[in-house]
A protein has these predicted regions:
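Intracellular leaflet-associated regions of eukaryotic membrane-associated proteins
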Residues: 1-196
Length: 196
């Protein structure tokens, strides 16, 4: 890294979590997209209820329950991932105690790597995120959808969030398929009457 880039990174504000202002464009897109998905599902359910038979209503009730659970889980896990601070423990400790760099005691064997930007020793699988400008423990990637680094303690919540979104989309597809079946069944007797 060039010396000028190093100075620029040291002078850039550290993002501790994904709720810090301003949100990225992709974060806003994800929030709006999630709201639109829920609204689209509610509209699909409203249109199915009007023409559904008993079996379709039971199926719709089960799908809606699963969808509701998935939405609640998605909101909870998205909040947890976005609000978390996956910083390296030494970096977080120095930041929380406002100590001078390198004054925190650490095990030389565990903290054998040094970050020139954070000016501290870090664990071997810690990487410096150029977007958040912090060293993140067990860094996997920076997620633009939540505006936070993924790794360490928030990795499991990230997988749970993705699973919740997958279940939401799967239920949405199944509900739209049910809607198409109901529409087809409703139109089928009319087409048979025309042939008579």
């Amino acid at each position: 890294m060039s010396p000028s880039r190093l100075i620029e990174m040291k002078n850039t504000k550290v993002r501790l979590h994904g709720f810090e202002w301003p949100p990225s464009c992709m974060q806003v897109v994800s929030w709006v997209g999630a709201i639109l998905l829920v609204v689209a599902y509610a509209l699909a359910v409203a249109s199915i209820v009007q023409d559904a038979d008993t079996f379709s209503l039971v199926a719709l009730g089960l799908l809606s329950f699963v969808y509701l659970v998935a939405v609640v889980c998605m909101v909870i896990y998205t909040y947890r991932v976005t609000a978390s601070d996956p910083s390296d423990p030494t970096v977080a400790l120095e930041r929380s105690h406002h100590l001078q760099p390198n004054l925190v005691e650490f095990n030389q064997l565990d903290y054998s790597y040094f970050c020139d930007i954070c000016n501290t020793h870090v664990l071997p699988d810690t990487k410096h995120c150029s977007v958040c400008n912090r060293c993140s423990y067990s860094f996997d990637h920076h997620c633009v959808w939540v505006g936070n680094d993924i790794g360490g303690e928030n990795y499991v919540d990230f997988i749970r969030m993705l699973t919740s979104v997958f279940v939401m989309l799967l239920v949405q597809i199944l509900t739209l398929t049910l809607q198409l079946v109901i529409i087809e069944a409703k139109e089928q007797p009319q087409s048979e009457m025309k042939t008579l």
